[in-house]
């Protein structure tokens, strides 16, 4: 993807200017905040006030991440007086959905980039690779082990978000099931 950036620049330079509202960028699985630098620079050049999540490398939800993410969203909203756009890449998109559910009054919209957003209690709608990675970083019993935890229940119940949501993905990425 990064190799195609020079060829994409002419098109990207015609992207509309932003209105200066805040945006929170969430990295993908095992991605650091540095993995978002190209997106951050692009969005800043387009006029958005973006920040990264401030939690370092994304190794999955860890104790305190849920409350830290919610606090960050609320702080950005309070500081700017404007609702925050959440942009999450891969697993960061799942975190963005969680944050949107927890602080919906502070969120303008959610954009997920190659994020697996369909999760059921048995993990049936989750690709095998993602299940394996989840077992590696989260719990040896897989996605079902966390199905009764409040954060998982929030995503599984799929309450309608009161803000717009855009999901961008590739049919060949191996992370997002085509039926989504």
Q: Predicted regions span which residues?
A:
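Short glycine-rich, acidic/polar surface loops and turns
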Residues: 173-180
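Membrane-anchoring hydrophobic helices of lipid-metabolizing enzymes
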Residues: 1-7
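Conserved serine/cysteine hydrolase catalytic core
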Residues: 15-16, 151-164, 180
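Serine-dependent carboxylesterase/thioesterase catalytic core
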Residues: 21-34, 38, 44-159, 168, ...
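Short boundary motifs at domain starts and secondary-structure transition points
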Residues: 10-18
């Amino acid at each position: 993807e990064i190799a195609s950036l020079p060829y994409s620049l002419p098109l990207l330079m015609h992207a509309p200017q932003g209105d200066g509202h805040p945006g929170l960028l969430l990295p993908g699985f095992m991605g650091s905040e540095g993995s978002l630098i190209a997106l951050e620079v692009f969005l800043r050049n387009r006029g958005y006030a973006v920040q990264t999540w401030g939690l370092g490398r994304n190794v999955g939800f860890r104790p305190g991440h849920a409350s830290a993410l919610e606090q960050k969203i609320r702080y950005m909203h309070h500081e700017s007086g404007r609702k925050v756009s959440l942009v999450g890449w891969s697993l960061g998109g799942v975190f963005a959905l969680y944050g949107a559910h927890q602080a919906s009054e502070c969120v303008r919209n959610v954009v997920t980039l190659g994020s697996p957003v369909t999760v059921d209690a048995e993990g049936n709608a989750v690709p095998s690779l993602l299940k394996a990675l989840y077992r590696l970083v989260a719990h040896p019993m897989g996605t079902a082990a966390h199905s009764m935890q409040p954060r998982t229940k929030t995503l599984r119940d799929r309450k309608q978000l009161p803000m717009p949501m855009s999901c961008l993905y590739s049919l060949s990425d191996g992370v997002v099931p085509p039926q989504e």
